[in-house]
């Protein structure tokens, strides 16, 4: 198959991933995303909380959404000791176990303040070692008093992110923090580029949505779903690659990097939409995998599905290793196949198409 991702695409991806977009503070990353999207869309807008939307064929009555979320997990400055050490609380599902020895950026009005998560040296720890927890992990920004910390511009409520570093391993693995889910934002942007470059005339209005605040409860998607009131929503997010060590396939399912997009079965996923996507995958010879969820998908799919009296929705997921770490890893072939599958599905959606079961 012809490759989709080009040099310009990967330059955008690197810039986008290396630009912090913590939950509730997504706007700098959203600017990067929207600037890339603008040549390929007819209109765009941003809502009050920062969700960005590009629109193709805005005057059509039938509305289709393709969606990803823009925010990343992070921390808040929570307490500053008189000695200048900083304790944090979570902003989203940040992992305390990986924090010790990590370098971070504290975002202040004066600019970025560098700091590290400190941890006692191995020589000094007792036989019964403490494990990292929210009670004992702390930041050190190289000063020795609360007043010195505050003089840097750091205060309670400042957001903290792990330092940026995107890389490509072995030519086909994307690695870095915040692939969950800015890689999704990248994928829907590439779908939009393909539609433009291939001069596709859609018979409906396409809303390309990069939602905020997914990591703390799908909040951005809830807001924008009410505003758009779409007739169909195709959501993309990441799921666990269960092929690496310490993963239990009996509990987590069998979804592996390099074997294609993952299509989810669950109550929020409208089966006629899912079957349409599967049919498009098979017709276009796009590999795919299956997953099942017992209740919610845990993604913005749920927010769209249960909005506006029910929006037919489906989820296309990218297998991801080491989720919510600084070394999240995705296979480039899977990224391309997710893009391809969304694109092929959009080509086969008809204006006015209904999805009721009977």
Regions found by a protein language model. Name each.
Residues 1-358:
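N-terminal hydrophobic/helix-forming segments and targeting peptides
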């Amino acid at each position: 198959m012809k490759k989709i991702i080009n040099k310009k695409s990967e330059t955008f991806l690197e810039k986008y991933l290396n630009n912090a977009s913590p939950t509730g503070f997504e706007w700098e990353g959203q600017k990067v995303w929207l600037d890339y999207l603008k040549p390929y869309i007819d209109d765009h807008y941003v809502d009050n909380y920062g969700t960005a939307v590009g629109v193709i064929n805005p005057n059509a009555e039938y509305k289709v959404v393709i969606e990803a979320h823009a925010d990343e997990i992070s921390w808040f400055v929570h307490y500053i000791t008189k000695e200048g050490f900083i304790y944090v609380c979570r902003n989203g599902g940040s992992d305390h176990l990986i924090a010790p020895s990590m370098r971070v950026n504290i975002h202040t009005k004066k600019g970025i303040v560098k700091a590290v998560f400190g941890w006692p040296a191995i020589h000094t720890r007792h036989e019964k070692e403490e494990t990292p927890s929210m009670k004992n992990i702390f930041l050190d920004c190289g000063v020795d008093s609360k007043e010195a910390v505050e003089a840097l511009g750091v205060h309670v409520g400042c957001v903290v992110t792990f330092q940026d570093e995107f890389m490509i391993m072995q030519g086909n693995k994307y690695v870095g923090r915040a692939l969950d889910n800015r890689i999704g934002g990248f994928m829907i942007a590439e779908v939009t580029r393909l539609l433009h470059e291939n001069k596709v005339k859609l018979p409906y209005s396409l809303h390309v949505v990069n939602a905020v605040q997914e990591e703390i409860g799908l909040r951005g998607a809830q807001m924008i779903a009410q505003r758009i009131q779409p007739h169909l929503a195709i959501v993309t997010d990441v799921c666990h690659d269960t092929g690496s060590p310490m993963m239990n396939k009996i509990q987590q399912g069998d979804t592996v990097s390099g074997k294609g997009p993952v299509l989810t079965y669950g109550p929020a996923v409208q089966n006629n939409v899912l079957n349409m996507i599967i049919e498009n995958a098979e017709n276009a010879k796009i590999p795919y995998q299956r997953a099942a969820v017992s209740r919610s998908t845990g993604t913005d799919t749920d927010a769209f599905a249960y909005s506006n009296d029910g929006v037919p929705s489906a989820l296309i997921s990218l297998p991801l290793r080491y989720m919510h770490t600084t070394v999240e890893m995705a296979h480039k072939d899977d990224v391309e196949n997710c893009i391809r599958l969304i694109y092929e599905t959009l080509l086969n959606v008809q204006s006015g198409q209904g999805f009721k079961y009977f």
